[in-house]
Amino acid sequence: MITFPHRHLLGIKGLTEQDITLLLDRADEAVKISRQREKKTSSLRGLTQINLFFEASTRTQSSFELAGKRLGADVMNMSVGNSSVKKGETLIDTAMTLNAMHPDVLVVRHSSAGAAALLAQKVSCSVVNAGDGQHEHPTQALLDALTIRRAKGKLSRIIVAICGDVLHSRVARSNILLLNQMGARVRVVAPATLLPAGIEQMGAEVYRSMAEGLKDADVVMMLRLQRERMAGSFVPSVREYFHYYGLDAETLKAAKDDALVMHPGPMNRGVEIASEVADGPQSVIEQQVEMGVAVRMAVMETLLLSQDQGPRP
């Protein structure tokens, strides 16, 4: 029997160390399932999962779809491009229409911060936030944590340097919250134009130099330069950005010899990370993709099979 005190996964904020550990432990078991020849289980047989993606994301949507199917759920992907949303239907109208179909879980990605939380107030099923604007991306932080824990054996008392476009990154926010909760030391390395106000209050140490920020780091997490979210000139040029804040083999030498190199994807090779590092021996980027399916399996199973969620609205 699973005991988990939440009906939804809207963010890392609000999760305890025990909540996170439970999800990671279950994800460890899901890794074993994914590596078997027979990968499908029946734990969610008869339950329905709807993936509602208002932002394109091939890897995240595919990961959620595969996670649901491996657990035996019926999975529906809603293509927003072909939906009533394009005809003027609001987010709430769409959600209420889907809710009338009695799904068991809605997986939502939206460009507006707080969209998943808003839906959770309106529907009678569980809601999983697959990324909401610049707010949070909880399953990405969980899969990053699982990747680190499996490689390092722990999350506490390690140094994690998160580098690049922190300002526009929901991945950075969720990771800072999770890693602090689990006892890690978190650094952010970025130019002033790509740092959000109040980042120190979230529990991150701020560095403006890669050499200083990466010193003795156990994990180096690079972030994509999100030019599609930029309304102004945040960096002088891509070439200059890579010179000062890109990760290549020489820059990586500042970190520990066994430091992990991570990236949430998709990567901009030659913008924030060099191919020699992305494809090098310290890279765990492919492992992150594998852990993503396992974490999403764990989240679905935990939310839908928990005996301690409280009454539905």
Curated annotation (Swiss-Prot):
Gene3D superfamilies per UniProt: Aspartate/ornithine carbamoyltransferase
Binding site for L-aspartate: 87, 170, 224
Cellular-component GO terms for this entry: cytosol
Record EC number: 2.1.3.2
Pathway linked to the protein: Pyrimidine metabolism; UMP biosynthesis via de novo pathway; (S)-dihydroorotate from bicarbonate: step 2/3
Gene Ontology MF, one: amino acid binding
Domain of life where this protein originates: Bacteria
Chemical reaction(s) catalysed: carbamoyl phosphate + L-aspartate = N-carbamoyl-L-aspartate + phosphate + H(+)
A Pfam family assignment: OTCace_N
InterPro entries: Asp/Orn_carbamoyltranf_P-bd, Asp/Orn_carbamoylTrfase, Asp/Orn_carbamoylTrfase_sf, Asp_carbamoyltransf, Asp_carbamoyltransf_Asp/Orn-bd
BP GO annotations: 'de novo' pyrimidine nucleobase biosynthetic process; 'de novo' UMP biosynthetic process; amino acid metabolic process
Keywords: Pyrimidine biosynthesis, Transferase
Binding-site residues, carbamoyl phosphate: 59-60, 109, 137, 140, 265-266
UniProt keyword Transferase, yes or no: yes
Segments crossing the lipid bilayer: none
First and last residue of the signal peptide: none
Family classification: Belongs to the aspartate/ornithine carbamoyltransferase superfamily. ATCase family.
Role played: Catalyzes the condensation of carbamoyl phosphate and aspartate to form carbamoyl aspartate and inorganic phosphate, the committed step in the de novo pyrimidine nucleotide biosynthesis pathway.
PANTHER family associated with the record: ASPARTATE CARBAMOYLTRANSFERASE, ORNITHINE CARBAMOYLTRANSFERASE, MITOCHONDRIAL
Subunit structure: Heterododecamer (2C3:3R2) of six catalytic PyrB chains organized as two trimers (C3), and six regulatory PyrI chains organized as three dimers (R2).
HAMAP family tied to this protein: Asp_carb_tr
UniProt protein name: Aspartate carbamoyltransferase catalytic subunit
Gene designation: pyrB
